[in-house]
Swiss-Prot record:
Protein name: Corrinoid adenosyltransferase
Native source species: Mycobacterium leprae (strain TN)
Pfam families named in the record: Cob_adeno_trans
Binding-site residues, ATP: 10-18, 28, 140-145, 166
Principal EC category: transferase
Compartment(s) of residence: Cytoplasm
UniProt pathway: Cofactor biosynthesis; adenosylcobalamin biosynthesis; adenosylcobalamin from cob(II)yrinate a,c-diamide: step 2/7
Length: 191
């Protein structure tokens, strides 16, 4: 599927509305837009981690796959489930259970060799770890926004992007620990 952007501004949103992928127009304050904007921000936070954190190639590959998935999540959130507009050139992009299963596999792969935690982890340590913690917290907000959109638009917004974001924040936590190579910065209660 090719995407061609010939012009960035359109002026169609200057009245406070924007178009969903089914060509309907909604207020820019619609919770679906909040959710996919938060996915976009999560994607940007991951991009900063990639640019400044110097991850190894395996983690880079994982994070770049996630960045692609986050675009799919945004497309899913902007496409009503009962969308009747079908264009074979532009198939609907949906988060599926396969996306979630892949995140769970990565969680298991990267978490298994880590030492057991005896306290909560403070964001920090290496630059990559700190940046992944920022991405994790943005992903948590995106998840809350996605659940709010599901609740506000029952039967219209899929729950799978919210589930994906839930698992994504878990993976980002695990990867932040991997980035600290076993030297987690631990919370000292009352410390």
């Amino acid at each position: 599927m090719a995407i061609h952007l010939t012009r960035i501004y359109t002026r169609t949103g200057d009245n406070g509305t924007t178009g969903l992928s089914d060509f309907s127009r909604v207020a820019k304050t619609d919770l679906r837009l909040v959710a996919y904007a938060d996915c976009d921000e999560t994607n940007s936070a991951i991009g900063v981690a990639l640019a400044l954190g110097n991850p190894d190639q395996k983690i880079t590959d994982v994070l770049q796959q996630i960045q692609n998935d986050l675009f799919d999540a945004g497309a899913d959130l902007s496409t009503p489930m009962q969308d009747s507009v079908r264009n074979p050139e532009y198939p609907q992009l949906r988060i599926t259970q396969t996306h979630i299963d892949r995140l769970e596999e990565w969680c298991d792969t990267y978490n298994t060799p880590l030492p057991t935690l005896n306290s909560f982890v403070l964001p920090g340590g290496s630059p990559l770890s700190a940046l992944l913690h920022v991405a994790r917290t943005v992903a948590r907000r995106a998840e809350r926004s996605a659940w709010a959109a599901v609740e506000a638009h029952p039967g219209v917004v899929s729950m799978l992007p919210a589930k994906y974001l839930n698992r994504l924040s878990d993976l980002l936590f695990i990867l932040s620990r991997v980035a600290n190579t076993g030297n987690d910065v631990l919370w000292r209660p009352g410390g």
